[in-house]
């Protein structure tokens, strides 16, 4: 009992440490790319080196760095070309911020869900009862089939004999003697 009590406070102590105040990995990557003067962009190794210089532990968070780069490429805020990453000249960020249109759609959907919810529950109960009754008989048949089929399949396998290896004729030795 003493070991379990000692483990639980440790877990509680770690949780506040995980909350980081500061830029995210993707923000750090974007900052590194904007700061670099390389025209061709930054390689993955150069990016990691830059992040390490900014105080980010790249060795521990290797997966996070890779996922952040993939997300940035998917968002088209970063362009990948021949193993190098560049900042996109025309990032499509302003198009996505449309909060006014989303709100009325959500309200309409909620109303529709409330109306449809009651009939769905009734039909689901009926279907479940039917499924339970039907499922019992096919299971028995399947078990019987499975038991019979392996016995039949095994008998011809035993009768097969292994292939005999053919002797290779060596033409190279004969030529060497001449």
UniProtKB/Swiss-Prot annotation:
The keyword DNA-binding applies. Keywords: Chromosome, Developmental protein, Differentiation, DNA condensation, DNA-binding, Nucleosome core, Nucleus, Spermatogenesis. SUPFAM superfamilies: Winged helix' DNA-binding domain (SSF46785). Male germ cells. InterPro entries: H1/H5, Histone_H1/H5_H15, WH-like_DNA-bd_sf, WH_DNA-bd_sf. One of its GO terms (biological process) is nucleosome assembly. Residues 21-89 form the H15 domain. It holds the Pfam family Linker_histone. It is found in: Nucleus; Chromosome. It comes from the Eukaryota. GO terms for cellular component: nucleosome; nucleus. Residues 1-27, 77-178 are annotated as: Disordered. Its main location: nucleus. One of its GO terms (molecular function) is DNA binding. Residues 8-21, 94-178 have a biased composition (Basic residues). Replaces histones in the chromatin of sperm during the haploid phase of spermatogenesis. Compacts sperm DNA into a highly condensed, stable and inactive complex. Belongs to the histone H1/H5 family. This is Protamine-like protein. It comes from Mullus surmuletus. The gene is pl.
